């Protein structure tokens, strides 16, 4: 499986126009990838920032997705404050823990998303698999998680939660037992 994450900085006051574009033009343009594009989600952590993540079959699908994405971006270039940043790669880890969107439709989810600069991506993920993911998978609030290895020193991590409170409750429990996040600090070079 392959994943693509996109960060778009757009001009202040253009959020409604951007949403309208995605609904009326951007998403319909992706119909030709049906079956190979598994999932796509966008969210706005700030009024002028749009983050998106898409999951697809393989690199070939990602190349087709990039073509459509670039054509779409040309149509909204007057809304953009800068050229988008794109991170893509093979899905390094990933798991859907609950099919809660089918069983319990939700109007909203909480997405925790980070780009990490690490000293060694494989070492970081081995530690993640050893001490973090087993605790994560037991939590009631987690829906799905994964990471994308961009290169040997860059990872994109994401977690879908039932709510913002569920994520923060998990972090508090994790730090109450032991400060798990501290164990990752020697492997970090930075994050955004």
What positions do the PLM features span?
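Short S/T/G/P-rich N-terminal loop/turn motif that feeds into the first structured element of a domain
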Residues: 1-51, 55-192
